[in-house]
Amino acid sequence: MILLSFIILFIFEKKTVMKKLILIIMIMPVLGTSYLNAQKLSKNSAFDILTKWEGKWKSNAVFEKSVWTNERVETRGKTETNLILSNNYLEIMVYNNDNTSKHIICYDQMSNQFNRWEFKSDGTNTFWTGKWNKTDKSMTWNYIDFSNYGISGKIIENFKSDDMIKTRVIMKDKSGKSLLKINLTQEKT
């Protein structure tokens, strides 16, 4: 009887070990990807990413109907970007109709992410954190809600070439309702 108990325990343990092994094999690619995304960028690598925005751009934006936009609206504007402060920060000036905004982007070595501050001519400002995806040549920004209203936001910038950026902006309230949707195309001039 004791021998049978050991055999059953061994078989059960073996199945558990196999299940754990299969689970580990399935989880490794996810952990590996997370590790790669969390790797530190060198100062030169961060500089190379920041220079992708540098220069003068013309933009065409489509604001889709949402809570913050009563109807679909198309706008045009221009953007001028320059590296500042020993090439550690990117200063972006956005001119769109009567609105002007200044964005500051930098790479934070401590958090292994990019930081983005946006200051608008109406006095409002926003803060975003970003991760660079080298494979897709895209930057994904996540909105940080200091107001605690439960607003979430994402900006996905896809660098289609050295001369074109396609951007999608989505902001939602805590229930998931769309507050803002923007599709933007920027072309270097």
Regions found by a protein language model. Give the residues of each.
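Bacterial Sec-dependent N-terminal signal peptides
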Residues: 1-41
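N-terminal helix-cap/turn-to-beta initiation motif at the start of protein domains
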Residues: 41-58
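Hydrophobic/aromatic beta-strand elements that line small-molecule binding cavities or substrate pockets
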Residues: 77-82, 102-106, 127-132, 152-159, ...
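Helix-adjacent hinge/juxtasegments
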Residues: 97-126
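Acidic, glycine-rich flexible loop segments
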Residues: 133-153
